[in-house]
Amino acid sequence: MPKTAPSPLSESAGEVFAQLAWLVRATRPQLAAACALSKPTVSVAMSELEAAGLVERDGTAHGLTGRSAAVYRLAREAGYVLAVDRGSTQVSFRTIALDGSLLDEDQTSQPDRAWSMIGGALERRTGDGPLRTAVVAVSDVVLPDQAADPTTAERVAQAVTSLRLPQAVPVAVENNVNCAAIAELHDGGDEHRDTFVYLQVGVGIGAGIVIGRRLLRGRNGAAGEVARLAYPWTDGREPGREALEARLGSPGLMRLVGSVWRNGDGPLPQDPEEVFALAGRGHERAGALVAEHAGEVGKLAASLVSVLDPGLVILGGGVGRNPLLTDGVRRTLAALSWPTKVEVSRLGERATVLGAAHLARDHGVNAVVTGA
């Protein structure tokens, strides 16, 4: 029977455990330096962690003076966490150890059967200690006060319930675009990016806002819900609720395509991928539509930049990642707002589940430290 920590760790043991989780492997002197603790204090902390079955020795390191020191890592019995991207058309998951090691991942295009995929994955983890926590990413606002919007709260609850996660496991829920922004912060390829906007353009639109390496959620959990921006903002026309998303989301793009496509343009494209593919091959009508769409997305980016001045906008989503969109967004942004770098996400469709995994790992380590 694996040993766990049924009660909170001492303050020093908690610090050492958290540092070892991020360092993956370390000696006691390295942990003492990382935690700014004395070597005797670290030794006592390590004894506590070893007794709890949370850490184990993993070889020996030899210094320049010839002295050797035991290397430690988290024990398998420390447990693992689960991250789920609960989309409307697909569900993906990752299970990771508390040191960040990937244990398993998979996806399905049958959301109503995702519980079976995830249940099987958890059964395969019986030798990896307890499941400490789960984070589920959803395509809705996650409300601090569910009474503020019971309809949205119920939709989120149903999405989580459909996964049939173990009842004893703490579950945190986060917006999918926010998760993608967290992934860009940690895995996007530039360790110096600490303030940026992740702008997702796909079936819907949304923004994840990171300021000083911290995700901005807002009072209602709705920071970045750009679908609610007033649109259109022009004389003689009243803005509609989420009208901007109706214009810039994939369904809106395809409605526009259908309204202007002519017989001489060839077969009507059935999805944005076809429109962009035709534009890439020099199709005049498709090229004009893509240019117009890029300009509209650029206006949205300019609105965000005018308020936040992030210095960097990262484009994501099925449409947002298309390179044909990027130049138009850059041109529009340059014409309307402050100097801002525009990049395309390199994480692709995995961004949301990667970000959820980072959150789950944070929660999991904290659960061990606090004895939750």
Label the model's feature ranges.
Residues 84, 98, 135-243, 361-372:
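Phosphate-binding/catalytic loop of phosphoryl-transfer enzymes
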Residues 1-60, 64-109, 113-130, 165, ...:
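ATP-binding/phosphotransfer module of carbohydrate and carboxylate kinases, centering on a glycine-rich
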